[in-house]
Amino acid sequence: MTLPGRARAVDPSEAELAVVIVNYNAGDYLRRCLASLEARRGDISVDVLVIDNASRDGSHEAAVAAHPAVRLLANPDNRGLSAAWNQGIRATTSPYVLFLNPDAELWRGTLAEYVQVAREHPSAGIVGPLVRNPDGTVYPSGRVLPGLRDAVGHAFLGGFAPGNRFTQRYHMDGWDRTTEREVDWVSGASMLLPRKVFDAVGVFDESFFLYAEELDMATRLRGAGWRVLFTPRVEVIHEIGVSTGRSRRMLVMHSTSVYRYYRKHRAPGWRRLTLPLAWSALRLRAELEWVRERARRR
């Protein structure tokens, strides 16, 4: 439902940019996310829409109360990220749509500059910013699609030996991310898409409940001739894991979504010959990550 009585800074039908934030028990991070958008809007009209997937912590109500220009759609159940993103697409009309995690904050640059980058690169179906961890280090958003060898190597070694050559290739570690360049995909924590791409390839695949939905969209867009662009002109800080958690269930869900992606996009021969190996590697990685997470909490 749409909560009535919210003051709006701009008519949503006239906004140049729509920002879609899917919330699920994000606590005070959502309020901070919204505050960063207000502080770094720039000279652009913005329609901010929070879609809540049945949070129990009241974060959506408290955050929107503090930011009355924000619209709220409150779902009675958790519909998953892709389905909620699609709700946001249907509920907005702006020519550009920014999908932003509730545990992410715009840190450098403005929303206006984000859109300007997209306008300067009309062939870009996705624009992603430089993403930083809370300690200021650079998170490797903007990656290549790994081949089977690198995917399995990263799955086995990435959590314990991040300097291994498989992970280095996957993360494009030889690039310092100070330059704008085309990549295979960017993190869904923050990505801007021109609305016209949804007419070209459709909306997000709702069979991806959580994880790999941005990877799937990037692959579909690149297959249709669009580019995926990384830009350092905008920076986002992302508190990874607040929106999703690091439970064993979430780690297994991540592996399941990645498996679903490879099953969907790889050729029949690849599926027939190597998919069981990839699935085993992904599940083993989930178990190893869970062991590491439990050890970290002690």
Predicted regions and their residues:
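Short aromatic/hydrophobic "clamp" motif used to bind/position activated sugar donors
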Residues: 97
